[in-house]
A protein has these predicted regions:
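Conserved eukaryotic protein kinase-like
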Residues: 1-148
Length: 148
């Protein structure tokens, strides 16, 4: 299961950067590094939409952290301290698939082009990840916001 990260650690170890990777309905995502000098890059989602109780959030974290599949990003940690909520995921160095389709509004990365064989590999990977969520995961996961 993902480990708890305290907000103070999140502010000093994760928020000491200015690279905003994106923003969605639940909050902004930033690039940071795992604490302890390991230089492992992570993606930190700072949640602004805080519906539900802390217990609801912890239940969701438990469910998400049980999902383990090569086509699903791993949850490494979380923060639930007072009103602060954050999710710490592994960092995907090639970025989100939407960069290849739309480009990025947060930096100067232009739209990237994919060859058909690579696009096919991505489609198959997305399908395998969704299949795992629907049929292969021991815990039933209702997925509303799948991002390929």
């Amino acid at each position: 299961m993902a480990g708890e990260v305290y907000f103070r650690t999140t502010e000093t170890d994760y928020m000491s950067f200015s690279v905003k990777l994106g923003e969605g309905g639940y909050g902004a995502v930033y690039r940071g590094q795992f604490p302890g000098g390991s230089n492992v890059p992570v993606a930190v989602k700072l949640l602004t939409n805080k519906k539900g109780t802390g217990e609801d959030f912890e239940n969701e974290v438990t469910t998400i952290s049980r999902a383990s599949h090569c086509n699903i990003i791993s949850l490494l940690g979380y923060c639930l301290e007072g009103s602060h909520r954050a999710l710490v995921y592994e960092y995907m160095q090639n970025g989100s698939l939407d960069l290849y389709k739309f480009g990025s509004i947060f930096d100067s990365i232009e739209r990237k082009q994919l060859q058909w064989h690579k696009l096919y590999e991505i489609i198959v990977g997305v399908a395998r990840g969704i299949d795992y969520l629907c049929t292969g995961c021991r815990t039933q996961i209702v997925h509303f916001d799948i991002k390929p």
